[in-house]
Amino acid sequence: MHGDPQQLELLRVARIGRAQGLKGEVTVRLYTDDPEWRFEPDSVLYSQDGETEYIVEGSRTFKDRWILKLEGVDDRNAAEALNGVELYGEADDAEDMLEADEWYPKDLIGLEARLVEGNGLGLPAGQVVGKVVDVVDSPAQSLLKIRLTEPVVTGQNSKGEDVVEKTALVPFVEALVPDIDLEEQYLTLDPPGGLIPGL
């Protein structure tokens, strides 16, 4: 047993998609940056309420997708019945994650977004761009939604009214978001020109 599910702190790991083949395998959309560990054989995943356990029997990748085989799901019909189910895993200890320089998407919300030293825009290091207000899932990668410190007029609409951009979406990849400091509550950005309005 893994303890009272109501006492577990659960984090969304994946959403089950379509069945793969005839033997009960399912494709999954990832919400974790550590699928190798989450999907090890005998790993336990949970429904959102923690009441239902899903035990990983095996996992593999195929064309950049992860495919899971869960215990008790042995044919295509059973696999198709799980389409849309979201899988949750136990959250790691926060202190251990800080030491390992790891974080969950929810940890990024509220962080100040600053320009990295030596950024490609040639602007001062530490210049505050805004604050992270959301982490948006997209098919390619997660996006950081940043509320800009200063709204930017980017043009005019057909009525001659100013178009004001108050937020920017930045792909959450290391090249654009090189540093994250949860203790100091900021992250750094190295955006190309045109990605963030006004820069």
Swiss-Prot record:
Entry's localization field = Cytoplasm
Recorded GO molecular functions are: ribosome binding
Start and end of every PRC barrel domain? 100-195
Instruction: Look up the record and report any one GO term of the cellular component aspect.
Output: cytoplasm
Q: Which GO terms describe its biological process?
A: ribosomal small subunit biogenesis; rRNA processing
Its taxonomic path starts at: Bacteria, Bacillati, Actinomycetota, Actinomycetes, Bifidobacteriales
Mind telling me what this protein is named? Ribosome maturation factor RimM
Give the transmembrane ranges: none
Provide this UniProt record's keywords sorted from A to Z: Chaperone, Cytoplasm, Ribosome biogenesis, rRNA processing
Give the similarity note: Belongs to the RimM family.
* Function as written in the Swiss-Prot or TrEMBL entry: An accessory protein needed during the final step in the assembly of 30S ribosomal subunit, possibly for assembly of the head region. Essential for efficient processing of 16S rRNA. May be needed both before and after RbfA during the maturation of 16S rRNA. It has affinity for free ribosomal 30S subunits but not for 70S ribosomes.
- Domain text: The PRC barrel domain binds ribosomal protein uS19.
